[in-house]
């Protein structure tokens, strides 16, 4: 019975830490870039795109295809950085214990 009470207490504490971590993630912003910094994309902690910054040199209609590719690459870079940050925060909550394969938090 004592072990069960201890497990329940740990579960409650972990839930509180996870909620705190989720709030922290939601408040952060991550910026990814591509094209040697010519395109920057900013995501919030939920992964929603909030801003795109494009070097004026890429506004040339002849460079439109490259610009489109760089926006996609910058989004992928920002998402990768966000996933890494979320993983770091989750390890803090779980004491370094990795999540089961395929289980991602908070997305």
Curated annotation (Swiss-Prot):
One of its GO terms (cellular component) is bacterial nucleoid. It comes from the Bacteria. The keyword rRNA-binding does not apply. Gene3D superfamilies: Nucleoid-associated protein YbaB-like domain (3.30.1310.10). Its main location: cytoplasm. Keywords: Cytoplasm, DNA-binding. It is found in: Cytoplasm, Nucleoid. Pfam families: YbaB_DNA_bd (PF02575). PANTHER family: NUCLEOID-ASSOCIATED PROTEIN YBAB. NCBIfam families: DNA_YbaB_EbfC. Belongs to the YbaB/EbfC family. Homodimer. Binds to DNA and alters its conformation. May be involved in regulation of gene expression, nucleoid organization and DNA protection. This is Nucleoid-associated protein GDI3467/Gdia_2910.
């Amino acid at each position: 019975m004592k072990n069960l009470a201890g497990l329940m207490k740990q579960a409650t504490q972990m839930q509180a830490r996870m909620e705190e971590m989720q709030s922290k993630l939601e408040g952060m912003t991550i910026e990814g870039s591509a094209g040697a910094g010519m395109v920057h994309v900013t995501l919030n902690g939920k992964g929603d795109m909030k801003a795109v910054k494009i070097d004026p040199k890429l506004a040339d209609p002849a460079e439109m295809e490259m610009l489109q590719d760089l926006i996609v690459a910058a989004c992928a870079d920002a998402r990768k950085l966000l996933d890494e940050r979320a993983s770091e925060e989750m390890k803090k909550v779980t004491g370094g214990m990795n999540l089961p394969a395929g289980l991602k938090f908070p997305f």
